[in-house]
Amino acid sequence: DKGIHIYTHGEMLPAHAYPKLKKYPHLKGNFGTAWQNQQKEFDNLPGAILYTTNCLMPVKPSYADRVFTTEVVSYPEMIHIGEDKDFTPVIEKALELGGYKENQVRTGINGGEYVVTGFGHGTVLGVADKLIDAVKAGDISHFFLVGGCDGARTGRNYYTEFVKQTPKDSIILTLACGKYRFNDLDLGEIDGLPRIMDM
């Protein structure tokens, strides 16, 4: 144990609900928002960055010295961790940089500090009776599946506005990076179930 805290980014957010991943005490949370915000969120980040998927923005010089890739992901001039999975360079860089000196508060794009995740099929099936009862009782009128990429540029906020306008007796199921446009909104609960369920 070297005291390194590990955070996911982007579409790795739902992984925090996976028992085989969340059993590791070094995994502390999710840093930042969607993949398209990497350049802003990784700028001057005092930690090592390991890309595991191809949602990769061009790497800026301000953090190029701390970027590593693995699996099918690669980027010119970045160190690639091969099949041997020797993460020594990543660990050494993390120790060298030391992380933030003080606790940081990060918000979603709407200012929210918390998101709930983990509503994969197993979890949803585990509360299916509760959902069915809520529908039969008239407490839930609609389910909306919002899957897609809203993007980060001004004016690309269709899903944000859509979700804000959904009836208070509806459930929003999320997929893909478009969720970052609204997953930090506090839309409340219905019968103890959050109105936003990140799948």
Positions of predicted regions on the chain:
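Metallocofactor- and cofactor-centric catalytic cores in central/energy metabolism, strongly enriched
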Residues: 1-199
